[in-house]
Design a protein with these regions (language model features):
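Charge-dense, helix-prone N-terminal extensions
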Residues: 1-76
Length: 76
């Protein structure tokens, strides 16, 4: 599955896109000034997204990659 397909599925399931997840991560204290804090681990993001949005591991890791800056909205 392409990264774009992950983002589309996540938006369909949760109603939230990349910008919304960035804002939510900031509110939760995972990011600061748009950057994932160094002490935040992937498992914390996965647990949050599973708990609050019922996302699976793969979809949660896509959001983690987005927050970490590994991928962006234009990644394939």
């Amino acid at each position: 599955m392409s990264f774009q397909a992950y983002l589309e599925n996540i938006k369909s399931k949760t109603g939230n896109g990349p910008a919304e997840f960035r804002n939510l991560a900031e509110e939760k204290g995972f990011t600061q000034n748009g950057q994932l804090k160094p002490e935040v681990k992937a498992g914390e993001i996965v647990a949050w997204l599973k708990e609050d949005f019922d996302l699976g591991h793969g979809h949660s890791m896509a959001i983690y990659a987005l927050l970490k800056g590994i991928k962006d909205e234009n990644s394939k």
